[in-house]
């Protein structure tokens, strides 16, 4: 059984309208799974503007860290809107020089994220941005990378949280804000 997409800030009319663009794809990536596709929402100019505004709203930060891949798109837009810089947290093999690397477990395997050298500095307040929070492994690794540079995780913000997967429990010490839940 699936739950409908819910907007957490019901007073945000633009975000409510944007949430209607989230597409449900049954049996993807495997039978029995209901995939929530936010791509149509990000492809719509008004919806994207509402998402970007909501992702950065109410957070005090010096720089944004966007998680590969859609976290790059969202993070860059949030950073531009707030006049800050943006750092891309990358999958392995994409950077010429790596400051830090975090390996983490996924439901079926493992993965890694890397922080580019010369980007984050000690004491910076970092807003971590990603598209979807599922099991929490990736977001937890992103927060570990930020801390490994001596920076502070000011908050983490995602477009969609899949609450049944319990990802929020992997980052209990982080101020986590989701725009939508399902």
From Swiss-Prot:
EC code: 2.4.2.7
Catalysis: reaction(s): AMP + diphosphate = 5-phospho-alpha-D-ribose 1-diphosphate + adenine
Gene3D superfamilies xrefs: 3.40.50.2020
Name of the protein this chain belongs to: Adenine phosphoribosyltransferase
GO molecular function: adenine binding; adenine phosphoribosyltransferase activity; AMP binding
Main subcellular localisation: cytoplasm
Annotated TM spans: none
Biological function: Catalyzes a salvage reaction resulting in the formation of AMP, that is energically less costly than de novo synthesis.
Pathway: Purine metabolism; AMP biosynthesis via salvage pathway; AMP from adenine: step 1/1
GO biological process: adenine salvage; AMP salvage; purine ribonucleoside salvage
Organismal lineage: Bacteria, Bacillati, Actinomycetota, Actinomycetes, Pseudonocardiales
The protein's enzyme class: transferase
Compartments it resides in: Cytoplasm
InterPro entries: Ade_phspho_trans, PRibTrfase_dom, PRTase-like, UPRTase/APRTase
Protein family: Belongs to the purine/pyrimidine phosphoribosyltransferase family.
UniProt keyword terms in alphabetical order: Cytoplasm, Glycosyltransferase, Purine salvage, Transferase
Listed GO CC annotations: cytoplasm
Subunit structure: Homodimer.
